[in-house]
Amino acid sequence: MTDVQCEPALAGRKPKWADADIAELVDERTGRLDPRIYTDEALYEQELERIFGRSWLLMGHETQIPKAGDFMTNYMGEDPVMVVRQKNGEIRVFLNQCRHRGMRICRADGGNAKSFTCSYHGWAYDTGGNLVSVPFEEQAFPGLRKEDWGPLQARVETYKGLIFANWDADAPDLDTYLGEAKFYMDHMLDRTEAGTEAIPGIQKWVIPCNWKFAAEQFCSDMYHAGTTSHLSGILAGLPDGVDLSELAPPTEGIQYRATWGGHGSGFYIGDPNLLLAIMGPKVTEYWTQGPAAEKASERLGSTERGQQLMAQHMTIFPTCSFLPGINTIRAWHPRGPNEIEVWAFTVVDADAPEEMKEEYRQQTLRTFSAGGVFEQDDGENWVEIQQVLRGHKARSRPFNAEMGLGQTDSDNPDYPGTISYVYSEEAARGLYTQWVRMMTSPDWAALDATRPAVSESTHT
């Protein structure tokens, strides 16, 4: 027996958007965004299929499931999945759905198991997702081919400890998908030969906003950090003896837009005072001076990359975001067009002193967590925007995303990709351009045809 694809019922759903109409929602040339991309239910349904159904999505960190049988549950879009370490050390990701009536195979957040049994009718699966036992099989299901009734398996690949999964067999491998973005990810993931480890625990909370607001901010928006958005958190975190006048936003920095793919990042260069106000003196000293920082400079190829990049933000399209230096990593799981579920954890250098690991844990809880002082600022802004967009007139005029238009460098000797000033929306335009590409391309062959005919940078 072979699987048959079942089309979802369309009753009560709005008709799909035509590709030509989707293409008009984002104007990269002028930096205009149609607000309906954040609210339209039909667009969201197409996102689940065309973006979340064929992008590489963050599943977690390898150290969260170190032993055979270790597992954690997660999501790919709105599809629940299981992430399981196998006996041979590999990791499998499969749909957390029993093939009998669609119940979750596993309802726990994580743990260690030798098998998984559906709580509805007792169908049992091994840690690889293979159906191994069916109650009353001989009497009730004579001739059942159990090998045909395992859950849908995803592709799994890792990059320096981070686990990613993809439903699409035709998607490029993870290394190709990340491209030059790996250069910027390494500022957090490759500071030491020991790599990174995840601090135990995942924080989860809900924000009533569209996923693209969160992804875009971490991709492109240092602008809000340099104005008034986080002023209260900065004031609350000022170390003793430091005056606010000493913490004027740095003026030197860059923003990175992926040549292709929608990834983006940005950071200040040189001035550590903003990091000091966010993470305190212990983390700032660890990041900027001493043996660990010097080792990072050697591995990353320059003192600037190892010790002088501050307050970096980054998004791997579509929904994997992180803040090197602060070291929070999160996935923005969509829950309809008007809500996200945030899953966040913290990584540290695996060979960092235990007291530094504890300092990172405490500081990320204070700053970027469900109750973090900076997290609250961001969430409040996104929620308020989403509420305003309930109005008809509020959705009737385009948003302005033209900051930094025409002010880019695609041949920077130190940093790969398209480079602009730190206060820019170049990376945001890249994210939304990739959104249009994926929403209007029928398959990965069509997507690959949109790649620029240039070789990838050789920066290391």
UniProtKB/Swiss-Prot annotation:
One of its GO terms (biological process) is catabolic process. Keywords: 2Fe-2S, Aromatic hydrocarbons catabolism, Dioxygenase, Iron, Iron-sulfur, Metal-binding, NAD, Oxidoreductase, Plasmid. Belongs to the bacterial ring-hydroxylating dioxygenase alpha subunit family. Binds 1 [2Fe-2S] cluster per subunit. Binds 1 Fe cation per subunit. Pathway: Xenobiotic degradation; biphenyl degradation; 2-hydroxy-2,4-pentadienoate and benzoate from biphenyl: step 1/4. It catalyses: biphenyl + NADH + O2 + H(+) = (2R,3S)-3-phenylcyclohexa-3,5-diene-1,2-diol + NAD(+). Gene3D superfamilies: Naphthalene 1,2-dioxygenase Alpha Subunit, Chain A, domain 1, Rieske [2Fe-2S] iron-sulphur domain. Substrate binds at residues 217-230. Heterohexamer consisting of three BphA1 subunits and three BphA2 subunits. The multicomponent biphenyl dioxygenase system is composed of a ferredoxin reductase (BphA4), a ferredoxin (BphA3), and a terminal oxygenase (BphA1A2). Induction: Transcription is up-regulated by aromatic compounds including biphenyl, ethylbenzene, benzene, toluene, xylene, cumene, cymene, and chlorinated benzenes. Is under the control of the BphST two-component regulatory system. This is Biphenyl 2,3-dioxygenase subunit alpha. CDD domains: RHO_alpha_C_NDO-like, Rieske_RO_Alpha_BPDO_like. [2Fe-2S] cluster binds at residues 98, 100, 118, 121. Disruption phenotype: Cells lacking this gene lose their ability to grow on biphenyl. Fe cation binds at residues 224, 230, 378. It is an enzyme of class 1 (oxidoreductase).
